[in-house]
Amino acid sequence: MTMIRMTRMGRKKKPFYRIVVTDSRKRRDGGWIEAIGHYNPVSENKELTLDEERLNYWLSVGAQMSPTVKRLAGKK
């Protein structure tokens, strides 16, 4: 199953996340198909960028969002 979820980037105690499309069987930071955005929870305004067009495309072909990405995308 194809998932839209976050992969951790950054350094120790300074997380930064990419929002990516990947196979659900891959590890959290394993290979991914496409990066469609990023999320920075450390910045003052919790910066979130998301390519809505690509998100809608992947949802239309059957990709499922992780609960965290679903929550973040709903706020945007």
Curated annotation (Swiss-Prot):
<dbReference type="GO" id="GO:0003735">
    <property type="term" value="F:structural constituent of ribosome"/>
</dbReference>
<comment type="similarity">
    <text>Belongs to the bacterial ribosomal protein bS16 family.</text>
</comment>
<dbReference type="InterPro" id="IPR023803">
    <property type="entry name" value="Ribosomal_bS16_dom_sf"/>
</dbReference>
<dbReference type="GO" id="GO:0015935">
    <property type="term" value="C:small ribosomal subunit"/>
</dbReference>
<dbReference type="InterPro" id="IPR000307">
    <property type="entry name" value="Ribosomal_bS16"/>
</dbReference>
<dbReference type="GO" id="GO:0005737">
    <property type="term" value="C:cytoplasm"/>
</dbReference>
<dbReference type="Pfam" id="PF00886">
    <property type="entry name" value="Ribosomal_S16"/>
</dbReference>
<dbReference type="GO" id="GO:0006412">
    <property type="term" value="P:translation"/>
</dbReference>
<keyword id="KW-0687">Ribonucleoprotein</keyword>
<protein>
    <recommendedName>
        <fullName>Small ribosomal subunit protein bS16</fullName>
    </recommendedName>
</protein>
<keyword id="KW-0689">Ribosomal protein</keyword>
